[in-house]
């Protein structure tokens, strides 16, 4: 059984060293924590509840946390991080 505990990187493949785990970004883009997925609905709920996790640009705009969903370059992660791509915000 996989040990889905501790720190991880969303860029690590597979996340947390096992395809049985998820890496949930925590505040910073390059650091997260490992967890056991308890089904697809829990991933969807996690994305809905986190202000910066997204699956689409529209989701970022609805959450008010940006207008661009930057997907992680990791095919084990079905989500990305919201950014504001407006040049005035830079």
Swiss-Prot record:
Keyword terms of this UniProt record: Disulfide bond, Knottin, Seed storage protein, Signal, Storage protein, Toxin
SUPFAM superfamilies found in the cross-reference section: omega toxin-like
Signal peptide: 1
Keyword Oxidoreductase among UniProt keywords: no
Residue pairs linked by disulfide bridges in the UniProt entry: 4-21, 8-23, 16-34
Matching InterPro entries: Albumin_I, Albumin_I_a
Prodomain residues: 40-47
The record's note on its domains: The presence of a 'disulfide through disulfide knot' structurally defines this protein as a knottin.
Identification of the protein by name: Albumin-1
Annotated source species: Phaseolus angularis
Gene name of this polypeptide: LEG
């Amino acid at each position: 059984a996989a040990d889905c505990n501790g720190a991880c990187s969303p860029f690590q493949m597979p996340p947390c060293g096992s395809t049985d785990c998820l890496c949930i970004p925590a505040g910073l883009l390059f650091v997260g924590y490992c967890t056991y997925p308890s089904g697809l609905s829990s991933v969807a709920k996690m994305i809905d509840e986190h202000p910066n996790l997204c699956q689409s640009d529209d989701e970022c705009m609805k959450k008010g946390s940006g207008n661009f969903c930057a997907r992680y370059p990791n095919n084990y992660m079905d989500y990305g991080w919201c950014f504001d791509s407006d040049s005035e915000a830079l």
